[in-house]
Amino acid sequence: MTAHGFLEITTPILTASSPEGARDYLVPARKHPGKFYALPQAPQQFKQLLMTAGFDRYFQIAPCFRDEDARGDRSPGEFYQLDMEMAFATQDDVFAVLEDVLPPIFAKYGKYDIASEAPFRRISYHDAMETYGSDKPDLRIDLTVQDMTALVAGSDFAPFAAGNTVKAVVVPDCAMARKAVDKLCADVEVQAGSKPYWFKVDEQGNFTGGIAKFLTDKTAEITAALGLKPGCFVGVTAGKKTAAQKTAGVLRTKLGMAVPGHMDKERYEFCWIVDFPMYEIGEESGELEFCHNPFSMPNGGLEILEKAERGEVDPLDIYAYQYDLVCNGVELSSGAVRNHDPEIMVKAFELVRLGEDDVKAKFPAMYNAFCYGAPPHAGIAPGVDRMVMLLAGEDCIREIIPFPMNKNAQ
């Protein structure tokens, strides 16, 4: 990082609470009874303030504290990230730094000696969900997700009912036994929360097993559209669009790992996921919410937000200059070109029913600093623990942490 002109600066550990997406860890303030410090979930606001103060390239190995549930790639409590920010920078500038820094490290110190070379592949969020069923696809797997919604329209099979999205994952030359298929489908249902279906193509080109009986009148059409041949196994998912996509993504990964010849495991395959939606409809609230980082610059700036406010543009069609770095199906980091203009920031929050007073109350230091003028800036923060997990070839992050917490954060 220093070779790229970055200056290492440490930011405060005892700070004020700020909405970052998880719950805070609080520390009582001895001299101020009834008040608390918060441990930082990320140095997000601090590093943006550094850009405003004239430090054009910052980095640190930043400790982050989040009270959130454990996962295979997420340890509860604390973790570390290679936090960086660049002034007068674009998305491409951020990509260029990490594409130069990371591959040599992974090739030299990783369990596998092959790593993607620059430039990393770029995939839009929409294409990632449509093609891989995931916004963190494992590109070592050569299987893809196909849409078969129109192909099964009018089917008597209840999950294919009108309004549902139907996805398929085709595996050529698959000799998986019925018992193994049942176990794989059960594992997918546990992980995705939705049941997958399946059928096979026999030597005569007929559909057999699973849900084949519901597709007999559409055999020729489905065969042509999906490119099926004798010996193919077809995994199928159905449901609301996002649920069907995500279940297909889990199914794709499980099949790629289970069926020989479809996963080149001994390599590090990086990619960028770009063009994330700025907004989404909240599952619980049913109202418009930020999809990811509220500090991201919308693609189209103030003009696109004003059009959305007037009803000329659907807010769900607004994209953010946000990106994720993914390696072997693991999200290493999220980053963004930041929203450095207070007018655009306020307008972005107004679309989710928060006004200027709310922005000032939630982000007073950053809002005030931006009012004096801030340079365009962008950044990212790859997770150090996750990188070490990949370097060591481990599937669980707790295996590489010297004193890890358990799933109950103990």
Language-model features and meaning:
Residues 2-410:
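Class II aminoacyl-tRNA synthetase catalytic cores and aaRS-like
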